[in-house]
Each structure stands twice: as C-alpha cells, then as structure tokens.
C-alpha cells in the first residue's frame, strides 16, 4: 500500500494541476499505475518483471473529467484497481511481453499524457522523502461533494449558524428565547426553510480566479450533478443548517430548489492560489 501510494502521489505532484486542467481525472490515469506498483511490491517483483507490469498498467491509463456529475467519475477508481490487477494476471499467466520503458523521458507516459519530460531521478529524489503518506498525507472527505466547494460550504455554515441562532429567527420560528447550541441543532433536523429565502436577494460566493473549475454545474438538475455545484451545496447549508448527504442521491432537483439556487452567484475577486496548493479548509 505504501509503495503504491508513494508512486501515485509523486506522479500526481509532477503532472498536476496541468493534467487536471487538460481534462484528465488522475484517479483513473494515475491510479492504475499506483495499483500496479502496489501489486508489484506485494508480489516481490523487480527489474524487468516490475517494468513490464508498470508498462501494461500505464498503457491502460484513462479517466476523463467530463464524467464529473455522473456515476462514471467514481467508476474510474474501480477501473484503475481492476486494470492494475488484470495487468499482473496477464503477465503471470500468459507469454505477453510489453515495453520495459514506460516512463522513457522522450516518448513514455509522462511525455504522452502530459507533454512533460520526467526522468527517473525526478522520481527517485522524491521517493519516501519523507513519504506521500506523511507529506502531504491522506485527506478524507467528510461529505460526498467536490473538494473545490469546501471553503464555500464552511462559509455558508458560518452564515447559517448566525441566522438560525439569532434572536429574531428563533423568536419567529420557535417562540422561545434563543439558546445558540440547542436552536442550531433544531435547525439541523428541520425540513428546508423556503420562507427564509423570501428575505434573500442574493448570495455571493467568492473564489480565486479559476478555483471553481471543477464545480461545473451552476444549475444542476440531479443530486449527482449537485456534487459539483457550489450553488446546490450552499443552498443545502442555508436551507437546512448543514449539508444533507442524502440530497446528492436524488434523481431530480425540485423547481423550488432551483429558484433558490438562482439567487446564488459566483465572483472571482480573491487572490490567486498557488498551483501547488490545495485548499481543504
């Protein structure tokens, strides 16, 4: 596992963000190579045997970001794992021979996929120094939506908390004096508050230039598309008090919800983020 994650992480750091910008989904394109590396380490492969395994995996490298908002995107992970295993089985049980130079600087995987030159030293110098599982480390999603929406969702949660624990809101809807923690929890369990939206003219979500590229749906029609829509995510937070994971599974988003989302706009007035950074909070 460590070996597979290490190679996958290093490759990802060398080709992204350009790889993503070109429309590739690295879970599929890089994941298959990581899977093969993990299998090779598990089976004790070295030299030519390992090179052929990585070669056969690399030639199956695929996964395109136009699948975002569909079941095709998470399927990339399964296909990458399957193809890594299949590459190993083919080489073990057939007489198949493959190139032993999948990462040749002049015409190998990096040159073909990313049009960049990467040498063996570029990988070796990064190998376990200190290790991809240590730096940058593993990061797990709490909710099933695109990570590009995390900051916007957290900002919306702050706004929602202030609104739903305010004296005016609590008095109007609960006819009791406000207790911030208690009333906030009450909102988390409540049905969506569309009356709240009657008082909203516009919700503005601020981004650095290009930081919302993965959030491709401004008016999603399904829950799956909503995973890649800051509008749908912010709507959930403001209507319920928190993101509702079940809403990403619905087949059709109601018109009333779409009307609320139409009041959410994006502006690009925040400082540009370094291409090597990934904002997670």
Locate each region found by the language model.
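Glycine-rich, mobile lid/loop segments that gate access to catalytic sites or pores
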Residues: 1-86, 98-106
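Terminal-appendage/accessory-domain detector
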Residues: 72-82, 89-281
């Amino acid at each position: 596992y460590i070996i597979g994650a290490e190679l996958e992480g290093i490759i990802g750091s060398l080709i992204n963000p350009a790889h993503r910008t070109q429309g590739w989904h690295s879970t599929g394109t890089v994941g298959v190579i990581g899977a093969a590396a993990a299998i090779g380490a598990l089976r004790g492969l070295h030299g030519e045997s390992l090179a052929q395994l990585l070669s056969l995996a690399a030639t199956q490298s695929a996964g395109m970001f136009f699948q975002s908002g569909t079941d095709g995107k998470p399927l990339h992970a399964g296909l990458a794992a399957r193809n890594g295993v299949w590459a190993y089985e083919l080489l073990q049980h057939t007489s198949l021979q493959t190139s032993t130079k999948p990462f040749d600087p002049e015409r190998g995987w990096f040159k073909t996929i990313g049009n960049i030159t990467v040498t063996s030293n570029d990988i070796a110098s990064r190998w376990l120094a200190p290790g991809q599982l240590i730096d940058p480390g593993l990061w797990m999603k709490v909710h099933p939506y695109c990570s590009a929406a995390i900051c916007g969702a957290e900002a919306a949660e702050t706004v929602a908390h202030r609104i739903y624990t305010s004296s005016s809101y609590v008095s109007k809807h609960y006819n009791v004096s406000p207790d911030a923690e208690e009333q906030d929890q009450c909102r988390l369990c409540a049905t969506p508050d569309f009356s709240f939206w009657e008082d909203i003219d516009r919700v503005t979500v601020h981004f650095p230039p290009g930081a919302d590229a993965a959030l491709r749906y401004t008016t999603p029609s399904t829950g799956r598309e909503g995973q890649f829509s800051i509008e749908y995510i912010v709507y959930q937070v403001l209507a319920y008090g928190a993101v509702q994971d079940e809403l990403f599974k619905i087949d059709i988003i109601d018109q009333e919800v779409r009307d609320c989302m139409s009041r959410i706009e994006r502006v690009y007035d925040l400082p540009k983020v370094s291409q090597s950074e990934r904002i997670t909070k």
